[in-house]
Amino acid sequence: MKVGDLKGRFFVVAHRGASGYEPENTLRAVRRALEMGVDAVEVDVRLSGDGVPVVIHDESVDRTTNGKGLVKSMSVEELRRLDAGKGERIPLLSEVLEEVKGKCVLFAELKEVGAAAPAFKIVEEMGMLDSVLFISFEQEALAAMKQLSPRSHVGLIYAKPSDGIVAAKHLGCEFVLPHYRLATEKAVAFAHRMGLTVVAWTVDDAETAAELKRRGVDGITSNYPDRILSLRKGNSG
């Protein structure tokens, strides 16, 4: 599936994989999401101490693994020795790409500006630029991605009331990802007028998801994607 295939239909994104059921940001969580039939999987990307893009949310490994320390102070080899839950390892970005290839879109959240170029290189080498949406709170990371290639698909995430929609348009984004509380009917309509696709995060109950769909949101990110997949019923094709 390509990023362009998400446009014009309602879609569901698995947050850090199906992280309500499996350890977040692991291949196990990604596979569970694929089994559910999601349209996209979102994962977090950082660099190891030796500059390899790995999939983990926090700056440190403390919360999600049995280890302690900063991701950037550990080599890939050291990171791979850790248990990220249920015996899973911290995946490489390349492993996640291999897992989703031909099955769904990948939302790769750049947790640091320095991850942009190495992540782009891997995605391009794997021939998956059309299947990956690079997203970030960091405008600089998205600007860097567009500079690396105008073909890169990018989306701006924001969690506070701001000029996020305007900023996204200026950055050359196709997507904007507001916290769901900021996805008001007015904001969604404005984003659509700017030609942006709106993805709200993170929603784990069907009632809130249905209300967001009513407001015109295009996609929803969830830790429990199976709870909201039924909202796709109105899609054509």
Language-model-detected regions and their locations in the chain:
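Phosphate-group recognition and catalysis centered on beta-loop-alpha active-site segments
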Residues: 1-237
